Amino acid sequence: MHLFSKSILPALGLCLLTVAPLRADVNSDLAFSNFNNVDLNALADGSILQVRGGLVYFQRGIITQSLYMVDATPSEVAAKLVHWNPADHSKLQVWIHKKLPANPKPSDFADLASLPNNSSVKFLRDATAKFDPKAPSIQVSKEEAQLLAASASQSGDAQNRFVTVWSQILAGRFTDFLNGHFSSESYAGQGGEIRSLDEIKSLIHSDPKVYIQFQRLFNQTPIRAAGASKSLPANLYYQSFDIQGSSTLVDGAIYQASNGPSIQSVDIDFYINYGVFATLELEEMWPVTVNGKTKTLVWRDDLVSAPSIAYLHGTERLASGLIMLQDVKANIEAFRSEFK
């Protein structure tokens, strides 16, 4: 937990930076989080506050929380979360990030052909070309394994086969996610079959206060509880990024809704074909005023389920959390630079 009480003075001490919430008490808004006694003056100066999430009883889970301010309105920040392209920031090692239509088809993944020729992507191409269903190095279902095995047995251009088979798999995952079949989606993982929905539900239930805060939004997405309301419109994308020197392919969906004076957002990476089982990124955005101008206070929660985390204990698990905090901070800095 971080406690900030120092006021920030502008250069030359010309005036005191004044920050005022548009509601009665920002700290009461943050009561569900791991932050309290937050000094908005420090955040208005560009600081990013970060803490590890609460105690996670889910063995494969790790969670971090961040708090920062953006020089824009909440609606502008929410829109940027949907439309920004992390691939424009080389430090993040995102090779491709593409928006998708409401019902993606295999033809919408043609940009897979534009993945860079680097060692990270080479891992993914080689794992596809040499796929062995008896010893898979990438995370796929039994049916998807058959597609990959058939592709690997074919002759012809390896690049075309790579694009064709992954276009089919990624589009198929979106179809199931959007049409009520997400609960049955799975893939072979260490220790047996892994169901993406189970991983996501374990993550979101790890912190009861955060779950209650976002329950209404969760229940308007495909991860909703049984009998919950219909899903909100989804902002869909796919991407490829580096995980410890190896590339992964990801299907993701962003859902947003107002929550009184704030806006909530959940970004669900519901299919990841290597290294990680599932991730979620939660944001809540409130308006604040700084010297008479509206800015946005952003609370962010990053939740990750990965096979390697289950084997970490003590200082190793702590170190993993610290590395994750650094990665999240780099992502926030890149995102915030889009407003300059």
Q: What does each of the following model-derived ranges do?
A:
Residues M1-P10:
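Bacterial N-terminal signal peptides that target proteins for export
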Residues S5, V19, H83-P86:
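Polar helix-capping/helix-linker motif
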Residues P10-V19:
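Bacterial N-terminal signal peptides
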Residues A20-A24:
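Sec/Tat signal peptide C-region and signal peptidase I cleavage site
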Residues D25-E76, V82, P86-K340:
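Terminal "cap-and-tail" regions of soluble proteins that handle hydrophobic small molecules
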